């Protein structure tokens, strides 16, 4: 495990150097940066980042956000929101995804000396990827089950997750992946169930994304409907690498798939992303 200091917070990072068979050294392709779900971490991705890096011929970087995995915890995670010595403490604010996308992720990309990475985001990580791509240069943006707005089905499932954490085995299962499981769970659950978060909506932000975009949504996702990707504004954009051709943004509806395409439909998800990125440097 490696830890890097980003704006005074130690974040867990993992470098994936997988390459296709027979390839030596760098491929020169933009690296993948993996952005995990609301209860995720480096470890919860398991070996899928390695699978995708191998399939695409790209190196990858995986990191755990503050309060997740082995990264620093958030002090007083259920207390009043505050800023102490330049760091946020207490409950997450409704703009926590914006903060991660526009402050933390740019600093991490700079620290790792990455240039125009390909973002691969799942759930909350998908929202972060979209927000980051709306303001910062990326080679492409791949999102799985992103949240672009709040739906009733999302709130219902997050309430059920709270019950499972307090009275079921969810806490025990999550504890395998997080140094501070209470911090990991409550920072996510509290903000999502707050009244202030109901107005979360990033559809307008998505209009300024200039990079190729691939969005996937499972039809059986209990945290969101197909609207989450259908309402991402999609345009036909000129391919900067080939001025006479175009890369279309793509939306995929995945059958027999829940909230985690990379786990529920691993082979298909990996194939779709690899094919999409084949035209991206």
Labelled PLM ranges:
Residues 18-76:
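Conserved HGGG/HGGXW glycine-rich cap/lid loop of the alpha/beta-hydrolase fold
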Residues 62-116:
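Active-site loop/oxyanion-hole signature of alpha/beta-hydrolase fold enzymes
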Residues 115-151:
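Conserved hydrolase catalytic core segment
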Residues 188-205:
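Active-site nucleophile elbow and catalytic-triad environment of alpha/beta-hydrolase enzymes
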Residues 209, 215-217:
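Short beta-strand/loop motif that positions the catalytic acidic residue
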Residues 211, 225-235:
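Short alpha-helix in the alpha/beta-hydrolase fold that links the catalytic acid
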Residues 219-224:
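Acidic catalytic loop of the alpha/beta-hydrolase fold
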Residues 257-270:
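Catalytic histidine-centered segment of alpha/beta-hydrolase-like enzymes
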């Amino acid at each position: 495990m490696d830890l890097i200091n980003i704006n005074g917070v130690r974040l867990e990072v993992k470098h994936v150097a997988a390459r296709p068979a027979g390839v030596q050294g760098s491929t020169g392709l933009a690296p993948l940066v993996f952005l995990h779900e609301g209860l995720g971490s480096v470890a919860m991705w398991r070996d899928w980042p390695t699978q995708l890096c191998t399939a695409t011929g790209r190196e990858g970087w995986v990191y755990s956000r503050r309060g997740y995995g082995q990264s620093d915890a958030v002090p007083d995670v259920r207390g009043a929101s505050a800023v102490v010595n330049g760091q946020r403490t207490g409950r997450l604010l409704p703009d926590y995804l914006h903060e991660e996308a526009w402050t933390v992720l740019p600093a991490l990309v700079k620290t790792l000396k990455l240039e125009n990475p390909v973002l691969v985001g799942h759930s909350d990580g998908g929202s972060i990827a979209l927000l980051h791509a709306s303001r910062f240069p990326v080679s492409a943006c791949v999102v799985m089950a992103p949240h672009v707005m709040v739906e009733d089905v999302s709130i219902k499932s997050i309430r059920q997750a709270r019950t499972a954490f307090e009275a079921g085995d969810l806490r025990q299962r999550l504890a395998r992946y997080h140094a501070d499981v209470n911090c990991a769970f409550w920072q996510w659950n509290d903000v999502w169930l707050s009244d202030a978060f109901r107005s979360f909506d990033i559809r307008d932000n998505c209009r300024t994304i200039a990079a190729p975009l691939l969005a996937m949504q499972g039809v059986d996702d209990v945290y969101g409907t197909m609207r989450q990707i259908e309402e991402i504004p999609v345009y036909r954009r000129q391919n900067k690498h080939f001025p006479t051709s175009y890369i279309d943004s793509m939306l995929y509806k995945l059958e027999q798939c829940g909230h985690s395409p990379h786990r529920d439909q691993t082979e298909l998800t990996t194939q779709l992303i690899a094919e999409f990125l084949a035209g991206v440097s």
